[in-house]
Regions:
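Small-residue-biased structural context
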Residues: 1-173
Length: 173
């Protein structure tokens, strides 16, 4: 393998993390748009909206579970000074899981016809989820992109770990 190829491999993990975060941000924005369309009376029926939410929630949960079980232990081993950062990120994951559960519960009880009370509750939950997720991603990117770019984990090259997977037409999953 030439040096350029090796260098690209070494910088790819941080770049891949950023790509996953961009994708998850886009998924959340698309879900928010679908929720707004539903409450404005011209969106998906509740069943389809719940399926849309489930897709986003599953992707975010898979990403964070992959970090907690795979990436963070590897980073902690190689960079022990980041253990507090990783602990903070895990705490965010727990908070995001709780918010995802709240959103899913609200969407499970959506009426067939939108109503203002439900709209307010759902929009508040999406706003809270978005705020925590954005803050979490920015913090994680500032703390871990350069670290990930400095790492060479052969098994991550051979089998893309869950925290770096994207479900799309490019075949990332």
């Amino acid at each position: 393998m030439d040096q350029n190829s090796a260098a690209n491999r070494l910088t790819s993990f941080g770049t891949q993390l950023l790509e996953v975060h961009i994708w998850l941000r886009e998924m959340l924005e698309d879900l928010r748009d679908s929720i707004d369309a539903y409450f404005n009376g011209n969106g998906l029926p509740p069943r389809d909206l719940r399926a849309h939410c489930l897709s986003f929630c599953t992707a975010l949960t898979r990403h964070h579970t992959g970090e907690d079980r795979g990436a963070f232990p590897t980073i902690a081993e190689d960079f022990p000074d980041l253990r507090k950062v990783l602990s903070d990120l895990r705490a965010d994951h727990n908070q995001l899981d709780w918010l995802l559960g709240n959103l899913q519960n609200l969407l499970e009880s959506l009426p067939e016809k939108p109503d203002p009370t439900t709209a307010s509750k759902v929009r508040e939950e999406v706003t809270a989820l978005s705020a925590i997720m954005q803050t979490h991603f920015i913090y994680e990117e500032k703390q871990l992109i350069s670290v990930l770019n400095s790492m060479d984990v052969p098994e991550w090259h051979e089998n893309r770990p869950d925290f770096l997977q994207i479900d799309d037409e490019d075949g990332y999953r």
